[in-house]
Structures are given as structure tokens and as C-alpha cells.
Regions:
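Short glycine/serine-rich donor-binding loops of glycosyltransferases
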Residues: 290-293, 311
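A short, well-ordered alpha-helix in the C-terminal region of glycosyltransferases
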Residues: 258, 339, 346-360, 372
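Short hydrophobic beta-strand element within catalytic cores of glycosyltransferases
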Residues: 302-305, 315
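A conserved mid-protein helix/loop that constitutes part of the nucleotide-sugar donor-binding site
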Residues: 199, 203-224, 241-247
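Nucleotide-activated donor-binding/catalytic signature segment of Leloir-type glycosyltransferases, i.e.
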Residues: 247-265
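Short alpha-helical donor nucleotide-sugar binding micro-motif in glycosyltransferases
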Residues: 93, 264-265, 272-277, 370
Length: 392
């Protein structure tokens, strides 16, 4: 049985021709591909980059033209090249039994339309915040509407999160993760450590506007201006379109000595870095269920996170596995940083609770949940780690 994945994810090849990508995408595609006999992955291509993770070795990779520009310019570019996109997608989707669409995204949305038109079994996962907030665009509102309308039958619709009540009728919650069972068995945090002499803060993720990093810079600067000592050191792990602007902002704000940009790291490098950190800070303006929260907790790091998406369910009570702050509120973030970094806290207990919480959030469990939902909704068989297609 063949799976086709339609994504706008940027990927690259090394000198040997192996395909790589960043973040949790290649790991999740590996987990998903393991459920099928064959997999086709449709992606966009960039120049060779650092810190990548290999796509499934036996996957067929089909390169889509990279949309040019941003905002409306990008939308017009996609519309102009729609015949090329649709032609390529139609050829690959026609030969597949199941199509996986990671939303939000313009190219995946086109792929979803082709899959519906060809009456294919469809798995759609919305990776952003399912709640409607002031960060929602007309495009993301349309995508959520389309998922609600199409949910059921051949269309397995998944929203990123956890909960007992479905996100919408005929839809399901699905957590997200980049953690493997092997990684959890390998990573052994020092649960007994408190704060470092110079507190080590870390942000993990894409350096993009929705992550709210300028607010974190402002909170850090406010701590310095108030004479807080010792001044914490902030490490930003990740790449993204805002990196140059953030480096400039840090310099203008006089934070260059306190902020480090590592760029994209592979999983091993990420783990090595996280084991030296004290607290993760994720000041996102919008989020579904962040893989960064789980990565941090796997390394015994409590998380200071904006109260968005599933943060309240993941963080728990104040001080349980971290702390919540109002999104975009510099004063609230500064206050919480001061409180966490200056108050006597049961660090050992907090770190142990973080690690224990994420034990079940593995890619193996993620793939099993998707397989179980497929069998329940489509009446398919699932044995020996593979889905068995039963034509309906």
C-alpha cells in the first residue's frame, strides 16, 4: 500500500544524494512511512543546510517548485503555478491509496483538494493552534472550516492537541512529538541539579514572528535594567526567517553578550545542549502543541510558555512542569522570569515531573495512534506494524 505526503517543507540533498529536512518533519514522516509498504514525499528544495535529519531512505522524493515571495505575493505565485503543482500532485496521488496532508500550508491545501477529487483516503493533520485567536488568518480559518466540513468517511481529520472532547464532530486530537523511545532511553538528565551559577535559558524552535522572541528580548533587557543578578544567558536553538532581524535587535538592545544563536541542530546536538540548560522559555503568540515543550521536558527542563493552545494541559498547574504567561505581555514574562530564577524551588521534583510526563509522547506512540484511528474509521487491519488496505 502506498502513502503520498504533500508538504511545502524545505528539504535538501547531501553529496551522496540523501534527502534531509529540519525539525520534527523527517522524524514524523519516518514514523508514518513505517505503516505503509511504499511512500512518496512531495517537498520543496533548498540549498544544502546544517543540522538536518534524513528522510526515509526508501521514500520516493518528488520536488515541487518553491513558491516565491511572502504573503499575498506568495499566494499569487502559487496561483500562477497552480497547473504545474496540480499536475505533479495528480500523478503521484493517483497512484497512492492514502494521502497525508500536514496543514497549514498552501501546497498541502492544493494536495488535499486533489486527494478529495480523486476520492483517496485522506489523513489531514492541522499542526497549528486549533483555537481561533487574533493570529488566525483568513487562509487558516478556511483550512479549519474545510477540515470540519470534510471530516468523516474516507477523510481522517486530526487537530494537534490532547483532550477528551473532540475538536469538532468526526475529528480527533493527535499529539505531536519528535521524541523516539530510543532517545528517551538514552537521555539521562541530572534531576538533582538546581540552577546554574549563571542561569541558562533556552528557546527551541523556528525563528519566526509567531514565536514572540522580541518580547523575550524586552523582558530580558528589563531584568538587566532592574539590576537583576546574575543576568541569565539565553540560547536560541533553531533557524528561520527572523534570524537576521533578531541578531540585529539583540545588538541594538545591548543583549549580544547574553544571547546566543546556535542555528539548526541535529537531534544529538540538541540533546547535548539541552542537558546543560536550566529552563526553557517559549513565548509564542500562537501554538498548538509544541514539540519544543516536550523536547525540553524530556531533558528535565520546566517550561515558561505563553498560555496558548495546549500549553495549559502540558504545563499543568503553576510550578508543576513549568509556568504560564500571557502571550505578548513583556511585564508578565519579566515578572515570571524573575520569580523562577530567584525563588527557592524544588527543582529535583519539578525536573522529575517533566520527564515522567513525556514518557508516553513518543513517535512510536504517535504512529500507533494514527494507525488505530485508521482502523477505527476505515475498518482496516493493523498487524506487524503495517496498515492493511481493505478496499471500500
Amino acid at each position: 500500500m502506498r502513502l503520498c505526503v504533500v508538504s511545502f517543507k524545505e528539504c535538501w540533498t547531501d553529496s551522496t544524494g540523501h534527502w534531509y529536512s529540519s525539525g520534527g518533519f523527517p522524524l514524523q514522516i519516518k514514523a508514518l512511512a513505517s505503516l505503509f509498504d511504499q511512500t512518496t514525499v512531495m517537498i520543496t528544495r533548498i540549498k544544502e543546510s546544517d543540522g538536518g535529519i534524513e528522510l526515509p531512505e526508501n521514500a520516493k522524493v518528488v520536488v515541487l517548485p518553491s513558491p516565491q515571495g511572502e504573503g499575498m505575493e506568495r499566494k499569487l505565485n502559487v496561483l500562477t503555478h497552480a497547473p504545474i503543482y496540480l499536475s505533479k500532485m495528480w500523478r503521484e496521488i493517483r497512484e497512492s491509496q492514502v494521502v497525508y496532508i500536514p496543514l497549514p500550508g498552501d501546497l498541502p491545501l492544493l494536495g488535499m483538494g486533489v486527494a478529495v477529487g480523486l476520492r483517496k483516503h485522506l489523513i489531514v493533520r492541522y499542526g497549528g493552534s486549533w483555537e481561533v485567536n487574533d493570529q488566525a488568518t483568513l487562509a487558516t480559518r478556511f483550512m479549519r472550516w474545510a477540515m470540519r466540513v470534510l471530516a468523516g468517511g474516507r477523510n481522517l481529520m486530526l487537530a494537534t492537541g490532547i483532550g477528551d472532547t473532540p475538536p469538532s464532530p468526526n475529528m480527533h486530537w493527535l499529539f505531536t512529538t519528535a521524541l523516539t523511545r530510543e532517545e528517551l532511553e538514552t537521555v539521562m538528565p541530572n534531576f538533582e541539579r538546581g540552577l546554574s551559577a549563571v542561569p541558562q535559558l533556552v528557546f527551541i524552535g523556528r525563528l519566526s514572528p509567531e514565536k514572540g522572541l522580541p518580547f523575550l528580548f524586552e523582558a530580558l533587557k528589563a531584568l538587566i535594567e532592574e539590576g537583576f543578578h546574575p543576568v541569565p544567558h539565553l540560547t536560541l536553538i533553531g533557524e528561520g526567517p527572523q534570524r537576521n532581524a533578531l541578531e540585529t535587535l539583540a545588538r541594538i538592545m545591548g543583549l549580544s553578550d547574553y544571547v546566543e544563536f546556535t542555528g539548526q541542530l541535529d537531534r544529538r546536538e540538541l540533546s547535548t545542549r539541552l542537558l546543560t540548560m536550566d529552563v526553557a522559555v517559549q513565548p509564542s503568540l500562537t501554538e498548538g502543541l509544541s514539540k519544543a515543550w516536550l523536547d525540553a521536558m524530556a531533558h528535565g527542563l520546566p517550561v515558561i510558555a505563553s498560555d496558548v493552545g495546549m500549553a495549559r494541559k502540558i504545563i499543568g498547574r503553576d510550578g508543576e512542569r513549568g509556568w504560564l504567561v500571557r502571550p505578548g505581555d513583556v511585564s508578565n514574562l519579566k515578572f515570571k522570569l524573575r520569580e523562577v530564577l530567584s525563588s527557592p524551588l524544588p527543582w529535583s521534583q519539578v525536573r522529575k515531573r517533566c520527564r515522567q510526563f513525556v514518557e508516553g509522547f513518543t513517535l512510536e506512540a504517535w504512529g500507533d495512534q494514527i494507525a488505530r484511528l485508521c482502523t477505527e474509521q476505515w475498518g482496516w487491519a493493523y498487524s506487524n506494524g503495517r496498515l492493511q488496505w481493505m478496499k471500500s
